[in-house]
Amino acid sequence: MADHGEHGVPEQQNAPPKKGLRFWLIFLAIGIATFVAALDTSIISTALPTITADLGSEELYIWIINTYLLSSTVSSAIVGQLSNIFGRRSMTTLALLIFAVGSAISGAARDTGMLLAGRTIQGLGGGSITTLSEVLVCDMVSLRERGVYAGILGAAWTLAAVVGPIMGGGFTQNVSWRWIFYINLPIAGSSLFLIVTLLRVRNPRSDTSILRRLRTIDWGGITLLTLGVTAILLSLTWAGTTHPWSSWRTIVPLILGFLGLLGFIAYEALPPEPTMPLRLFRNRTAATLFVMAFIYSLLLFWVCYFLPIYFQAVLNATPTRSAVMLFPVATTTAPAGIVAGILMTKTGRYRSFQYIGFALMTIACGLFTLLDQSTTTGEWTGYQILFGVGTGIVFTTGLPPILASLPESDVATGTATWIFMRNFGAIWGTAIPAAVFNTKANALASQTIDDPTVRGLLVNGGAYERATKAFVSSFKSRPAVMRAIRRLYVVSLREVWQVSIAFCGVGFLLCFLVKAYRLREELNTEYGMQLWRPVFKRLVCTWYLAGSANLMCT
């Protein structure tokens, strides 16, 4: 297998540092930061109705979620290059502070506008944390080892996604919805303390003036990217709900959004330090894996948003019960990712795992087409396990080969681009299946629902909005109508899963374009960990271990 690790770029080669107490405490801080950033993507779901009623948000309720999604997607893309300019430690500290400030504002919100402002600030911090966590790991361990640590961070993310809705419901019911934001302060604070106290990484530009560094920021690219993503998210938020897909209010912002992204890509050839260097996309392996990250994330959100519709509308589950019924996906993704990371570290191979991952996802989505009222618990659980294992494998084995194909100087921008593509895929992971579902539901309602009143409730996005146990069960006194409604959901969802198979197939075929690179066992980076300053070493080791004679602070 050819070694493509040399790119003609001068890099500092080091043996990976010893993994003593300092290393593990820093990694703990990174894991905590990842957990708290992921928590805010899910904790609000069960509290949203209460928040909306308390603040009188009405039709603005969707933006309580979308402002966070928008700002985190943009910040995840731009913070990689900013960390090259201002240093990893400074940007990580700033990201945690921004996230904490946004959490405090959200928790103290007195109206919807204040909450939206807080959520936007939170997203800027949360998206930055997600990218910087991966970048810091890349600076701390060799490329060969990164899969294991990526798997552990993935486990932290999955844990947050699982416990988030439960925590949100618990706080809302027993304390106050405001504590779903306030709880972030001590968690982020503990991570911030460890980062500020322990993290020391090299910054090649530490002698450059702040003004000169500010001038190197890709201001034009950031503006175009923000406008493009905002327009697309605006269109997808309106599509099928506020306005039909055929409405100019949906089509125009969508077109403008794509034009904005095309303008961003064209502009990236101009600045000396672009947010997403075009050389990343000229590399076949990196470009392919960026697309695979988009598809993987799209499919994960596809499944996690549309299986609950099946559970509630077809299997008659409550919203809380449907969240529990998603546990087979949530609890297998992280372990599968960790195992894949360990095997990748031991063997240095990743392509075979990618084939296996996408094959399992394809099989699972094919099996989802069999779901109906008669599907047993064992069957839908097994289908989810296959999908969870596949997504865990694909997630963990995605970033290391990207970085293996690029010079170490592109670690931050390559990582940021990979995470941006994941986040961008998540945006489409609800929009595409919703469009498929609503189109099929409209056709079926016209063909199979005779009652014009009931038909009116199910067309134009109504079936998607009313996919609840309460709605379907309200027709118990009219068994024929209830059977027809359940049949509408089964057939519409079957088409959703059939379309997902096509995306899985594209992901599998893209695996053939990924080259085999050597995963370097040495740590080549300009941003690696510095030796600890003696004062900090004595202070922190004493604080943690109370003067133990066997300090392992390296």
Swiss-Prot record:
What membrane topology does the UniProt entry give?
Multi-pass membrane protein
| Gene3D superfamilies xrefs | MFS general substrate transporter like domains (1.20.1250.20), Multidrug resistance protein D (1.20.1720.10)
Instruction: Name the source's superkingdom.
Output: Eukaryota
Q: What is this protein called?
A: Acurin A biosynthesis cluster MFS-type transporter
| Alphabetical list of CDD domains matching this protein | MFS_Azr1_MDR_like
Glycosylation sites (chain numbering): 174, 283
* Transmembrane portions of the chain: 24-44, 60-80, 96-116, 123-143, 151-171, 179-199, 219-239, 251-271, 289-309, 324-344, 352-372, 385-405, 417-437, 496-516
